[in-house]
Design a protein with these regions (language model features):
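Active-site acidic catalytic loop and adjacent metal/ATP-binding pocket
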Residues: 187-194, 203, 292, 352-402, ...
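Short phosphate-coordinating micro-motif centered on Lys-Gly-acidic
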Residues: 2-6, 11, 105-163
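Conserved nucleotide-sensing/catalytic segment adjacent to the nucleotide-binding pocket
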Residues: 67, 71, 75-117
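ATP-binding pocket architecture of kinase catalytic cores
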Residues: 193-325, 331-332, 360
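ATP/Mg2+ or Mg2+-diphosphate-binding catalytic cores
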Residues: 458-519
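Active-site activation/catalytic loop segments of kinase-like enzymes and analogous catalytic loops
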Residues: 325-334, 400-436, 452-468, 481-489
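ATP-binding glycine-rich phosphate-binding loop
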Residues: 170-196
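An alpha-helical support segment within catalytic cores of ATP-dependent transferases
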Residues: 297-312, 317-318, 322-366, 379-381, ...
């Protein structure tokens, strides 16, 4: 094992025996996908055959599959459940030019390729790949795997290494991993980990958010809108909510730099059923907000030793850039053209005026996505702890009315107007009981304004998810959000904005003798 090999490796794994080599190959196979290239090298007896056989068998999902050496055939191709697997040995290759004759690029474009003797290809292989070199451990006891990622695989290898270290440290290294359905996030994903005894946990994969293009005064949209840029915000809010006695997930382990968290699995029981909101569960979620909003809350929360998270303010700049999403994405989606400069300026001026009273009102922790996809019913617990909370990393210091509107005008399921009104009344009564100074009429105005702001924003977000992110299934929710917005614009506090929507989005705001779109 040369000093150069060790110095260049991004990850060095000690493999004490034959079984450890096979186990490592199986775990590495979980990380590979169609189009990946893995190059494998090492001296005679270093364990290449053992490693390659275990890797191919795992990828093919056939534990007893025969995996002969491709030394004389150059390539062996296997059918996998997700994609083909190409196992190649280039020892007999004369040069990289022969890959063209073999049709290598076409053969491996949608396959996982494992190549032994990659140096014989003379640099003709994809530069984005994972290189694994096996060698004898010092003293001849076991083997050592030296892994290096090149090109785009360099960052992937760092995440793989961080994940393996995290689950090993937390005692979850042998758990089965199941991907979970993706949410509206373009950078965050989840996996459910299941141990042999049935115990489960969730892996939250939330790498640092890449800086987007500047959109205003040199700042990207995410910074202006106060969206979390690292996993630190989730950790801080999680600890803060748990300290108040709420059912946020316990964090078993973390790698803050990699953006990996191993967290408690709160379950899958929702607050809705096939008919829509379950009133008793929505009522309990409403009471949770009453308790949160009636509590004096810190603005700075600890993340870990020496690191704190300051909850950002939900300021005018953030609120306005959110409503602009309607102009940027929803209007072109519905009307087919952009707003004129004057129409856009009027829109922003009216929203600035409407939000003025919000900005001087009381603030609290605004969790921001407090609605059915992020609320889990935990019947085995008692009281407010039956409401499990997730997806609160974008929390800001904002108006109490925002999260109430987020819940009672749920973006993913229609909340009937009578249930909405009943739960608004529940919230107002219990806030008033906790604090006689609570201003019910001011809250009602704030609710209408923030519900309209949120609906306006979401119309833009769902149109953007379709056009920019290739997620058209969010468009099915537009009629519901439109109906909510119509409901909100009926409040006198939004009279001027209602005229604007009637003028520039007549499809959205019908004439008084027309029937509004159903939810």
């Amino acid at each position: 094992m040369s000093e150069q090999d060790v110095s260049q490796a991004a990850w060095i794994v000690t493999l004490p025996d034959h079984e450890a080599t096979e186990d490592f190959a199986r775990k590495l196979a979980e990380e590979l996908k169609a189009g990946d290239l893995v190059t494998l090298s090492g001296g005679l007896g270093a364990g290449k055959t053992t490693f390659a056989r275990a890797l191919v068998r795992t990828l093919a999902n056939e534990p007893e599959l025969e995996v002969p050496s491709p030394t004389f055939t150059l390539m062996q191709i296997y059918d996998g459940p997700l994609c083909p697997i190409v196992h190649a040995d280039f020892y007999r290759l004369s040069g990289g030019y022969e890959l063209v004759e073999l049709g290598w690029e076409e053969m491996t474009e949608n396959a996982i390729a494992l190549v032994e003797w990659p140096e014989r290809a003379e640099g003709a292989l994809n530069p984005d790949h994972l290189d694994i070199r096996l060698d004898f451990a010092p003293g001849g006891r076991g083997r050592v795997a030296m892994l290096t990622g090149t090109g785009t695989f360099a960052s992937r290898l760092q995440r793989i290494k961080a994940f393996r270290n995290l689950v090993d440290r937390c005692g979850w290294s042998d758990a089965v991993r199941l991907p979970m359905p993706s949410d509206a996030s373009v950078i965050r994903s989840y996996e459910r980990l299941i141990k042999m005894n049935g115990e489960t946990a969730l892996l939250m994969i939330s790498p640092p958010r890449p800086a987007g293009p500047p959109v205003r005064r040199g700042k990207p949209y995410t910074t202006i809108a106060k969206l979390a840029e690292t996993v630190h915000a989730f950790v801080a809010m999680d600890k803060g909510l748990r300290a108040l006695g709420f059912s946020a997930p316990y964090i078993y382990g973390e790698d803050l730099d990699a953006g990996l968290l191993l967290i408690e699995d709160l379950g899958v029981d929702p607050v809705v059923d096939e008919k829509g909101p379950i009133p008793e569960r929505y009522a309990e979620a409403t009471r949770l907000l009453v308790k949160l909003h009636s509590t004096e809350l810190p603005q700075v929360l600890p993340v870990t030793d020496g690191i704190e998270h300051e909850i950002p303010p939900y300021d005018l700049e953030a609120l306005l850039i959110e409503v602009e999403l309607l102009a940027d994405w929803y209007v072109p989606h519905i009307v087919g053209t952009q707003l004129s400069g004057s129409a856009r300026a009027e829109f922003l001026n009216l929203w600035t005026e409407a939000l003025g009273e919000i900005l001087v009102g009381p603030t609290t922790w605004t969790l921001r996505d407090y609605h059915s996809p992020n609320l889990i019913w935990m019947a085995e617990r008692e009281g407010l702890q039956r409401v499990g909370l997730i997806d609160f990393q974008d929390a800001v210091l904002g108006p109490p009315a925002y999260d109430v509107a987020s819940l009672l005008q749920d973006a993913r399921v229609t909340v009937p107007a009578d249930l909405e009104l009943k739960l608004i009344g529940l919230y107002a009564r219990e806030r008033k009981a906790a604090d006689p100074a609570f201003d019910v009429s001011a809250f009602a105005r704030a609710y209408a304004i923030m519900a309209a702001q949120r609906a306006t924003k979401i119309l833009g977000i769902f149109a953007r998810l379709d056009r920019r992110d290739g997620k058209p299934h969010y468009l099915k929710h537009l009629p519901r959000i439109e109906a909510y917005l119509i409901r909100n614009l009926a409040h006198p506090a939004l009279a001027k904005l209602k005229v604007w929507y009637e003028s520039y989005l007549p499809r959205l705001i019908p004439l008084e003798d027309e029937t509004p779109p159903s939810a």
